[in-house]
């Protein structure tokens, strides 16, 4: 059953006003879905505080993925699957955002070219400036949507999604046709991704588990950044807020694993 609007949504609007400002909220008052998605990752994002940036969270992810809290998924993937590569690889990264992972990979001699595809030109420009500063010449940047990109004319040794696949519609078609079309026969697909409920419509059991976890955290660590509010519980996310904030957010995420 869909939750259209919840207390969580009202609280989030208040928090976003304090963290990202009125201009960010006003950017959502448009019928242009692409502009909404782009604004979700604008410069004001730096004024937010997100749980996935917590070092201990990252260490746990590393441990769950690689077995070692100090080894991230990129290093693990390179060592386990690419160490025997016969020639430098050509990579396509879809929804690359700020390209922080691609900039790290580009420093590895295994990669001949990494094509970063994203709809946010500002983020790509920032990444290009960082690449120039680091002396990296094997990164290229393409500001297009997946509908505009010509998959048929390209061939890649590897295609990667890093927290971006859940922003694409019709995951089955994207992976089964478009990605398959541009991936070489022995090519690899790397996915580091949120694979939960579409539009974050978590079940009652999941919400209960989240609230149980919240109660384990001491109050000082539950204060919402740049506000005087403390997180006491999670009410569930409303479908409408997710859509208005970013129409691409978790749009087909429930189908990632089945695909």
Regions from the PLM with identified roles:
Residues 93, 98-148:
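Class I SAM-dependent methyltransferase SAM/SAH-binding core
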Residues 60, 65-88:
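Conserved alpha-helix/loop element of class I SAM-dependent methyltransferases that forms part
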Residues 172-188:
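A short glycine-rich, Lys/Arg-flanked "PGG" loop and its adjoining helix->strand segment in the class I
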Residues 190-226:
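Conserved class I S-adenosyl-L-methionine
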Residues 1-59, 67-72:
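N-terminal, positively charged/glycine-rich alpha-helical extensions of SAM-dependent methyltransferases
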Residues 157-170:
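A short SAM/SAH-binding and catalytic strip from SAM-dependent methyltransferases
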